[in-house]
């Protein structure tokens, strides 16, 4: 179920404050965050946000096409290494 429009998008307060400070100064630095559920809003465009995936912070450069998506969508938590190869020698 999606979030009600009258509530507006969820963005962590600490993350939004950091973005607004950087926009006022005009600086571009990587902002580390653990808030994967925060929605990408227009003030974030052009910033690089380090999104935690459970092991490390993955840098995500925010573009205008990402607005409305969540930060966690761009930081995969699972590593897929492929299925096991067929071992013909083991079958003999």
Swiss-Prot record:
Organism lineage reads as: Eukaryota, Viridiplantae, Chlorophyta, core chlorophytes, Chlorophyceae
Q: What is this protein called?
A: Small ribosomal subunit protein uS19c
Q: Where is this region: Disordered?
A: 73-92
Keywords recorded for this protein, A-Z: Chloroplast, Plastid, Ribonucleoprotein, Ribosomal protein, RNA-binding, rRNA-binding
- Source organism, top-level taxon: Eukaryota
**Gene3D superfamilies membership:** 30s Ribosomal Protein S19, Chain A (3.30.860.10)
Entry's Gene Ontology BP terms: ribosomal small subunit assembly; translation
* GO MF term (any one): rRNA binding
Q: Which PROSITE patterns match?
A: RIBOSOMAL_S19
Subcellular location as annotated: Plastid, Chloroplast
Q: Which GO terms describe its cellular component?
A: chloroplast; mitochondrial small ribosomal subunit
Q: Could you say which protein family the record assigns here?
A: Belongs to the universal ribosomal protein uS19 family.
Per the record, a Pfam family? Ribosomal_S19
Gene (UniProt): rps19
Q: Look up and give the organism this protein is from.
A: Chlamydomonas reinhardtii
